[in-house]
């Protein structure tokens, strides 16, 4: 993987600018490892021997590393991406995903983020702002665009990042990624000028057990406008006293932050009183429940997520996918829709049904899939009326006169009428001869069928086969691909239908709520909690035809042509995962078996047969 060769110092730090800064590569081993493929800066440093501290800003700017060494100091974005994480869940985070797909990307940041990081480094080291950031309410204009919209709270950074408390929260992530966990005083002073906070509380700078390493303790109780300026003065004093100082405690690898279980934990959120829960009980950390095949599995840490994923990959066959699709669709779409528009829909459905009932049977029957034409001896009568548009000549080549006339219902040109005269006998063939004749006719028939099928296929007709066995094979093969996502279609088409039906009445009144139940909502929706993000991710994976798990992608696109099948599907909705205390505003709820049920009083019990339940709309007495 990596070859050893003699060190070339030019690779490492081109020039130490001033002698006071310790060159972190003083004691580089005699061989130095040149990585093949992408490695992280830390692995690169370790391969260079025992390097004292972490690299700081100045180093990063001067550092010349071989290609493929990633310079980020923090290689992934924590799940703080979501403003309110539900307690202790693990989102599908690029690093985690990469790890369990088995293609670990060492650095899961996007290229764009890395570019902005390097621009930030250049800016901070290039010059000084007109007014230092610690004097004004928000960071100076040039940096403002580089601050993320997302705030990093200190709880999300482990030890060694205490210096971030004096830095604007919107810049913390970028600073952590470019600066690492122990910042040099010289670099820190520049950072304070560009992205320092004006008021953060009273502070104290403590010397730690290790030489030249200091720790900042901040007490946020008493904040004033002068905090930033005072802190800057203090750090300036420290820089004069000890030019080699670094700020940020020493990292202890045994600390809780480094246990893989809690590495990507999200800080707990302050609970809010909601109408649903009614009280604020903080139950501690609830694990995320993830379905692995038929089993639910509790996930509290990255480790668990990896294990669950492994399991899921092992037994995640077609049926699971199908069930999962059905569940997710129903959960996301149909349920929402029903909860809001149920009375309307049921009225509508009743009206539609009564209209259907008046129509002739042919239009009431559900459309069936096109039959595969199997041109066999016994089912000659199934042949299509015009033999797939062959010319008369072509037809007479393929079919015996008998077959053609049979299909056409014409009198055949030459036929012996059995005579009425009892003396003229039609002697029956002997059994053996009959068998021979039939066999011969069948053989000829097979040859013709093969020729016909071949020609039809060449003309691009897809559903013609030459023999029964081929028909069976084709059917099996098609079913394997075609019906993999059948549950998904059912749900999708139910949604399409409901949407088409209630469009006119509902759209105006329902406004945003209506739009929420459309499919595009799934794509535009910004997750509000990590769990939500998880659900969305998996729903999107199921929906995105490009990502369908090796199943026919065309099948997903059937959508609109499909909505005719959804007539009964409407009344059946998968059971929601969480059963909440009954909400007086929602009509009815969903029984165990997924049929909708309207109200539970004894008066309605006798009405609850299938037909009535689907057509009757009960008044709700408050």
Swiss-Prot record:
GO BP annotations listed: proteolysis; symbiont-mediated suppression of host innate immune response
Pfam family, one: Peptidase_C7
Alphabetical UniProt keywords: Host-virus interaction, Hydrolase, Inhibition of host innate immune response by virus, Protease, Suppressor of RNA silencing, Thiol protease, Viral immunoevasion
UniProt source species: Cryphonectria hypovirus 1 (strain EP713) (CHV-1/EP713)
Active site: 162, 215
Sites marked Cleavage: 248-249
EC code(s) of this entry: 3.4.22.-
Entry protein name: Polyprotein p69
Keyword Protease: yes
Mutation effect (residue 162 to S): Complete loss of autocatalytic cleavage of p29
